[in-house]
């Protein structure tokens, strides 16, 4: 179980060109922190989410900059080196702050096309830059679009066809608008 930190280029590179300006943007705050901005809300790269190799006293809940993080948090080649140092063979990844828990941030997007494309971009980035480079070491855990069950199924199937073996889902699907399984 491992978390990835989405790199600065993810959404600009992997979202459809006509939607990129509406997707998540990495911005710098007045205090010099780097945070994600999406639909008027900000999502911090919280220090507690990227603490590998840091002394506990240097960690806070303040947002980190990418140049303050260990590169293995967001770069797969550096991550593999870190895993080798720790004697770890494989990792099952989970997303970071910008997606929200299980992709809920994108499911709540006011423009569903943008939300769906952000989910696809995240999965395409994970597939292209992490899993494809180290398929024997990365157990790809995708996210899906939780705003529509049919779209969720399409994204899960799309990822399964290319080797994803897991998907991150909320433990209580009814909390994101899916039917309550116990009320059948």
What are these regions (language model features)?
Residues 2-184:
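Helix-coil boundary/capping segments in enzymes
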């Amino acid at each position: 179980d491992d978390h990835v930190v989405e790199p600065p280029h993810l959404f600009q590179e992997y979202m459809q060109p006509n939607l990129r300006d509406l997707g998540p943007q990495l911005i710098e705050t007045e205090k010099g922190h780097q945070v994600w901005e999406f639909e008027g809300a900000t999502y911090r790269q919280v220090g507690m989410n990227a603490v590998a190799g840091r002394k506990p006293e240097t960690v806070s809940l303040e947002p980190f900059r990418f140049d303050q993080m260990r590169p293995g948090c967001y770069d797969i080649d550096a991550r593999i080196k870190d895993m080798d140092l720790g004697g770890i063979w494989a990792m099952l990844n989970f997303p970071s702050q910008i997606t929200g828990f299980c992709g809920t941030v994108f499911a709540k997007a006011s423009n569903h096309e943008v939300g769906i494309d952000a989910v696809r971009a995240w999965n395409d980035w994970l597939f292209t830059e992490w899993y494809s480079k180290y398929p024997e070491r990365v157990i790809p855990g995708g996210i899906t679009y939780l705003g529509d069950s049919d779209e969720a199924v399409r994204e899960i199937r799309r990822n399964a066809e290319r080797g994803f073996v897991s998907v991150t889902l909320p433990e209580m699907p009814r909390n994101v608008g899916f039917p309550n399984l116990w009320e059948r």
